[in-house]
Every structure is written in C-alpha cells, then in structure tokens.
Amino acid sequence: YKNPLIRTRRKEFKLSNGDLTSIYNSRTFCLYEDIDRIIGQGLAKGGSLKNAIVVNKSKILNDNGLRNKDEFVSHKILDCLGDLMLSGHRIFGHIKTSQGGHQLTNTLLREFLLDRSNWEFESLEGKEKNNKDDNYPSPIAVNA
C-alpha cells in the first residue's frame, strides 16, 4: 500500500498449534477516500469505526487507533485463513503473499484444487489431535 500508515508490512504466522490469539481481533481496514466507492458497490453494510479501521492520509480516524501495531497485516492473514477454510478441508502448506485479498486467495484456492497433482487427501486417524482442531473437517488436503 502506498499509504504511509499501512505501507508494506510483514508477519510470519504459524497455525500449526491452532492458536489464533495474535490475529483474531484484527479489523478490516479501508482508506477514507474509498468509502463512497465501497458503499456504491454494495459493500461495507454494517461497517463502522467499531469494526473497521479507516485511514485518512496519515491519520487513523478510529478514536483508539490500532489494537496492535500489526493489525493491518494480521487482518490480511485472518482473511486468507478464512478464505482457505471455504475449501471444506484443512490445508497443510506454506503461503506467502503480497497485498493479498479475497480475490487473490480465491484464485489461488481454485487453481490449487483444480490440479490433483498439487494435493492429496490424508486421514487424521491414528494421529494425535489438538483439541483446537476439532472444528476442522476430517479430510486434509496437503501439498504433494
């Protein structure tokens, strides 16, 4: 992002232990100058300064600012994980992205799943389960 507050940020996140505490409360964000366009597209229904960060040039309009210094990139990670869960399978792998978003993750997931040489199903049977994983589907798609 060209905005000085958002800019390029990096964060490594490992979900292997099922712990989302470092990203779960990160909010979506937008630039103030994009609000009319976003609303015009029928998006941001219910959006407010309580559930979204609004950035106006070099100022965050939310009274309390960011919840943490990594909130922008943490929300991008949270979005990516949520989009990947739409596959209906737990995916084991490594993802690296730059300015990711829903459309990019959707394209990645579609292309990945279309080519069966990219993945295979693996059963969790006989493997130690983490209690936090109980809400994930049983079959697992893995990188081949």
Regions found by a protein language model. Give the residues of each.
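Short acidic-hydrophobic catalytic motif
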Residues: 1-144
